[in-house]
C-alpha cells in the first residue's frame, strides 16, 4: 500500500490516478450524446463536456510531472495510452453528434449565444466608464472555467459566460472581429485568405490601436508583455486611457509548434498570468471593469495522426488547414459539413463562399500541419469561447466558507490525533476563503502545536474539499479527555468547533511495563 505523503513521485502517480478516475467517472455519467437542439449541446458543454477536456489536460499536466525512473511509470504509461485513445474517441463522438445537429437544425444561427463579432457592440460599447479587455489567444472555455475558480479567491466579483466564435475558428479571422467595426470582408492573398476590418488588415498592435481610436477617442491596444514588464508608473499612464485592449498570446504561440508537455504547461502559464494580472488592473490602476475573452479554443490530443487519419481534400479551395477549408463548391462531401461563410463569420462579401469542416474532431490533410494542437473547425472545444466579466466590488457581503469534523469518535493514539475536516462550501463569488487555527487543548491551554489552515478550495466536489489533519502532543498530559478546538483566525476567543477527544495514549501508558 502506497502512502501518499512518503514519496513525491508516488504522490504524483496517485494524483494522476485520481484525475484519470474523475475523467472516467464524468464520462460514464454523460448519458445519451444525441440531443435535440444546438442550445442543448452548449448547455451540456458548459455543465459536463468541458470537464472531460479539463480532466484530460490536467491528467497530461500531472503525467509529465512523473519521473520516468519511478517504479510505476510503465503502468502509468499504459493508463495514459488508453486514456489518450478513449478521450479522442469520446470527443469525436460528442462532436459528431454536435455537427450533425448543426447540419440538421439550421446551423450556428440556431445557437442562442453572444456572437463573437458582436462582442464590442453588445458588451463594451455601452460602458461609459474606464474598461480593459484582455484577448487571450486560444483560451479554451475549460481553462477559463478553472481560471474563474482561482479568481474567486480575489476580492472582486467575476462571472463566466459562453459566446460563440466565428468560423473558421482561426486567429486571423476571430481576433480582429472582437474590435469595433462597421464591416468585415474576406481579403484574398494568393492561396491564403485574410480578413479586412473596415477595409484594413489589422495585423499589428499599432494598426489595431489606430483603428480602435476611430471608435473611442483615446483608446489603445497593447501587448500583454508590455503591461507585465512595465512598472507601476508606466502602467498608470496606459490605464489612463478610457479603453485598453490587451492582447495575450501564450497558449496559441506555444501550441502550434509545441509538444504535449509544452501545450498543457502553456495553459497553466496563461491561467497563472491572467490570475495575477486581473486583480492588479483593478487594484493598482483603478479600472472597475475587466473583460477577458478569446479568439477561439482548440482541440488537443496527445496521439499520433497517421496519413489514414487525415481526411483528404479533393475540391478546389481558396484556403485549407487541418480543420477547415474555404471553397465555392456547394457539393456534399462525405464526412464534411459545409456552412455559408456569411452566416457563420459576419463577413459581408462572401455570399458565394462555403466553409467546410470535418465531422467530429477529424483532421484534414493540409500543408500547414499541426494535428496534436489545432483549431479552425466547428468542434465545441474550438467554437465555445469564454467571456469573463470582472468587476471591482467590495466583498463585505461575502460569507466565509464553513468547516466541519467528519470523524464521529475522536481518539488519540500514540500521542497523535488524525482526523478529517470538510470545507463545507467551495470558495466562489458568493463565499470567501477562511483561515482557521486548529489544536488540542487541556484546560484552555494548547497541548499540540497550533496548526494554521487556509480553507480556500474552489472545487465543487465535496470529496476534493476534505482535509486530513494530524496533531501530535508536545506536552505530557495525564487527562483522559482533551478538547479539539477550531478557531477562525480572526477570532481566537470563540471556537467555531469544540469536540471532546479520548486520550488513548494515557490508557496505553497504563499497561506500559
Residue ranges, per PLM feature:
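Feature captures the catalytic ectodomains and active-site-proximal regions of enzymes
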Residues: 1-513
Amino acid at each position: 500500500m502506497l502512502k501518499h505523503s512518503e514519496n513525491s513521485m508516488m504522490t504524483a502517480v496517485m494524483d494522476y490516478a485520481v484525475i484519470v478516475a474523475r475523467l472516467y467517472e464524468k464520462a460514464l455519467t454523460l448519458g445519451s450524446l444525441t440531443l435535440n437542439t444546438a442550445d442543448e449541446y452548449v448547455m451540456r458543454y458548459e455543465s459536463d463536456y468541458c470537464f472531460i477536456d479539463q480532466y484530460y489536460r490536467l491528467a497530461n499536466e500531472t503525467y509529465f510531472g512523473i519521473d520516468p525512473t519511478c517504479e510505476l511509470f510503465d503502468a502509468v504509461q499504459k493508463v495514459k495510452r488508453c486514456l489518450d485513445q478513449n478521450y479522442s474517441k469520446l470527443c469525436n463522438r460528442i462532436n459528431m453528434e454536435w455537427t450533425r445537429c448543426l447540419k440538421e437544425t439550421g446551423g450556428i444561427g440556431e445557437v442562442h449565444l453572444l456572437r463573437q463579432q458582436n462582442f464590442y457592440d453588445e458588451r463594451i460599447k455601452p460602458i461609459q466608464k474606464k474598461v480593459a479587455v484582455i484577448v487571450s489567444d486560444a483560451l479554451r472555455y475549460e481553462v477559463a472555467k478553472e481560471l474563474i475558480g482561482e479568481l474567486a479567491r480575489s476580492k472582486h466579483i467575476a462571472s463566466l459566460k459562453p459566446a460563440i466564435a466565428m468560423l473558421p475558428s482561426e486567429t486571423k479571422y476571430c481576433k480582429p472581429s472582437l474590435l469595433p467595426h462597421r464591416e468585415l470582408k474576406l481579403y484574398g492573398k494568393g492561396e491564403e485568405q485574410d480578413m479586412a476590418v473596415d477595409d484594413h488588415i489589422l495585423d499589428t498592435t499599432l494598426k489595431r490601436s489606430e483603428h480602435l481610436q476611430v471608435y473611442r477617442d483615446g483608446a489603445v491596444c497593447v501587448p500583454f508583455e508590455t503591461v507585465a514588464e512595465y512598472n507601476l508608473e508606466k502602467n498608470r499612464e496606459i490605464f489612463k486611457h478610457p479603453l485598453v485592449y490587451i492582447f495575450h498570446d501564450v497558449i496559441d504561440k506555444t501550441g502550434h509548434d509545441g509538444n504535449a508537455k509544452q501545450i498543457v504547461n502553456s495553459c497553466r502559464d496563461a491561467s497563472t498570468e491572467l490570475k495575477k494580472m486581473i486583480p492588479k488592473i483593478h487594484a493598482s490602476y483603478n479600472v472597475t471593469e475587466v473583460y477577458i475573452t478569446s479568439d477561439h479554443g482548440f482541440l488537443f490530443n496527445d496521439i499520433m495522426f497517421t496519413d489514414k487519419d487525415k481526411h483528404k481534400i479533393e475540391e478546389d479551395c481558396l484556403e485549407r488547414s487541418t480543420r477547415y477549408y474555404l471553397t465555392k463548391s456547394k457539393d456534399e462531401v462525405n464526412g464534411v459539413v459545409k456552412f455559408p461563410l456569411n452566416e457563420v463569420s459576419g463577413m459581408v462579401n462572401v455570399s458565394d463562399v462555403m466553409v467546410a469542416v470535418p465531422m467530429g474532431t477529424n483532421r484534414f490533410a493540409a500543408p500547414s500541419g499541426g494535428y496534436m494542437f489545432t483549431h479552425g473547425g466547428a468542434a465545441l472545444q474550438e467554437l465555445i469561447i469564454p467571456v469573463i466579466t470582472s468587476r471591482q466590488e467590495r466583498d463585505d457581503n461575502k460569507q466565509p466558507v464553513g468547516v466541519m469534523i467528519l470523524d464521529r469518535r475522536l481518539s488519540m493514539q500514540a500521542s497523535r490525533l488524525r482526523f478529517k475536516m470538510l470545507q463545507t462550501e467551495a470558495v466562489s463569488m458568493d463565499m470567501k476563503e477562511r483561515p482557521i487555527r486548529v489544536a488540542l487543548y487541556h484546560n484552555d491551554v494548547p497541548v499540540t502545536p497550533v496548526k494554521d489552515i487556509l480553507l480556500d478550495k474552489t472545487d465543487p466536489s465535496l470529496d476534493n474539499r476534505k482535509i486530513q489533519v494530524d496533531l501530535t502532543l508536545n506536552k505530557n498530559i495525564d487527562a483522559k479527555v482533551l478538547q479539539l478546538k477550531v478557531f477562525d483566525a480572526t477570532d481566537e476567543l470563540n471556537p467555531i468547533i469544540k469536540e471532546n477527544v479520548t486520550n488513548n495514549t494515557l490508557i496505553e501508558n497504563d499497561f506500559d511495563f
